[in-house]
Amino acid sequence: MTLLTFRDVAIEFSLEEWKCLDLAQQNLYRDVMLENYRNLFSVGLTVCKPGLITCLEQRKEPWNVKRQEAADGHPEMGFHHATQACLELLGSSDLPASASQSAGITGVNHRAQPGLNVSVDKFTALCSPGVLQTVKWFLEFRCIFSLAMSSHFTQDLLPEQGIQDAFPKRILRGYGNCGLDNLYLRKDWESLDECKLQKDYNGLNQCSSTTHSKIFQYNKYVKIFDNFSNLHRRNISNTGEKPFKCQECGKSFQMLSFLTEHQKIHTGKKFQKCGECGKTFIQCSHFTEPENIDTGEKPYKCQECNNVIKTCSVLTKNRIYAGGEHYRCEEFGKVFNQCSHLTEHEHGTEEKPCKYEECSSVFISCSSLSNQQMILAGEKLSKCETWYKGFNHSPNPSKHQRNEIGGKPFKCEECDSIFKWFSDLTKHKRIHTGEKPYKCDECGKAYTQSSHLSEHRRIHTGEKPYQCEECGKVFRTCSSLSNHKRTHSEEKPYTCEECGNIFKQLSDLTKHKKTHTGEKPYKCDECGKNFTQSSNLIVHKRIHTGEKPYKCEECGRVFMWFSDITKHKKTHTGEKPYKCDECGKNFTQSSNLIVHKRIHTGEKPYKCEKCGKAFTQFSHLTVHESIHT
């Protein structure tokens, strides 16, 4: 009895085929192959881990595995054998025998092997229909690619022509002889000829809605699995489902690729190594940035300010900070950094000039009207299961859902608050549940959001990534830097409604308001004294505990107050920044300068209530009062 093996459900690509897949399609391929392997492993149909799976887990290019296996002398276990077996177990009738032979798929009879049905049933029971359909899409792509690159298609291929240019022209010349009439590629490409889009598939918006549909039919065999993956990911995002769970820590993820990346944290594996400094990294993106650091290379240049930047993400942020506002609303003149922001703004105007007579729906743009025409014509090539609306090309159910119910589709059942994004609703729910899933490993403090934990960790690491360009001072959080910048600009945006005083910080205004209300909500449990601010209570408690947290690194002396250690440090440095304008004498502390100035002014603010004698310093008054007692 021949049991089903991983080879029977695996798909392997050559280097040329792999290059035709974009990043999203390559990630989908990894997800599907890894899931197939796990399903086989769970029913005991495989024991040893194949080299392809190891390669995919390490995010290496899988075509290397195929080339290595061919070199090892196992041609009978190559791609063509696996492809035909995979088609049989999936029950595929989409590709006729002539097409399989043209693609070089040989070595297995068209009937299933004896004994294969039992193991196939176990395997397919674990696979979702979407995964099985995706495998078939990959096989169709592989078959058509082989046809396009066969000898009678490429014999007159010009040297300067690449695979992408040759694909549509060469496949139409002889695909009818290969039994592929059911794919309707000839009619689809004739529509593409009308738009002259043989080399530029990004100009789809210039074509009619009918041509859009035909272009999609062509793309069905080159990028059809991209639509499946995008729709599947959007549905998961909308429902909040996280089906992939880490067995080590219990954390769940929406995508299998996210789980794979996360598992590297537990294993400690770092597959990418920098040749300059020797550091290893888990992800390729992490690897690329340190290489730029070591070499000093800054390959990204901002066209706005001519700054050269090491990473593309920093370039994007630089453009935002540089005030690059490239998208302007023609109606109101408002400008935006991103096109999506302009689109949302235009939706807010509520003007919908385009109307479709079939259903009386109105649309903001004519492109939206064209999409509606295609939907009513029955050309629904992708479907959002949540909202039951069709999307004909590049579907975006998320935006559709937000527009469908007024822009904020996610509602809290506890307090009826509504949110535009599901992630915002998830964060909000933690207010009601009290959940704090993000915990600091150092001190055990927990937070509701990961960003808050990241900021907290900087307390332990001492990291201060935000620097003021004016004075060079560094800060732990971006908000602290924003508050600090007001000291340079003298901006005071916060005004007290009671007395009209203005403040630079909101926290300062909050503290000030308590002077009007007389509120002192913070009480000392030891002596019952009340304070307006929690920080004042914390400092006060040191009197009872005797805590002295501030230590001088020079002499080892400890102090209760931060201001005391600041003053003390000046005794080591000899710094005397406070100078008397009258006599030129310098002092380490401003309070000493104030007392000294009374010598010149003759001011004596401290008066004895017994005899009326006055003194320049409070300490002198205290000594004098002991005479009366």
UniProtKB/Swiss-Prot annotation:
A zinc finger (C2H2-type) spans 244-266, 272-294, 410-432, 438-460, 466-488, 494-516, 522-544, 550-572, 578-600, 606-628. GO terms for biological process: regulation of DNA-templated transcription. It is found in: Nucleus. There is a cross-link at K383, K492 (Glycyl lysine isopeptide (Lys-Gly) (interchain with G-Cter in SUMO2)). The modification N6-acetyllysine is found at K408. Expressed in adult heart, brain, placenta, skeletal muscle and pancreas, and in fetal lung, kidney and brain. There is little expression in adult lung, liver and kidney. GO terms for molecular function: DNA-binding transcription factor activity, RNA polymerase II-specific; RNA polymerase II cis-regulatory region sequence-specific DNA binding; zinc ion binding. Keywords: Acetylation, DNA-binding, Isopeptide bond, Metal-binding, Nucleus, Repeat, Transcription, Transcription regulation, Ubl conjugation, Zinc, Zinc-finger. The keyword Nucleus applies. One of its GO terms (cellular component) is nucleus. SMART domains: KRAB (SM00349), ZnF_C2H2 (SM00355). It comes from the Eukaryota. Residues 76-243 are annotated as: Spacer. Disulfide bonds: none annotated. Belongs to the krueppel C2H2-type zinc-finger protein family. This is Zinc finger protein 195. It comes from Homo sapiens.
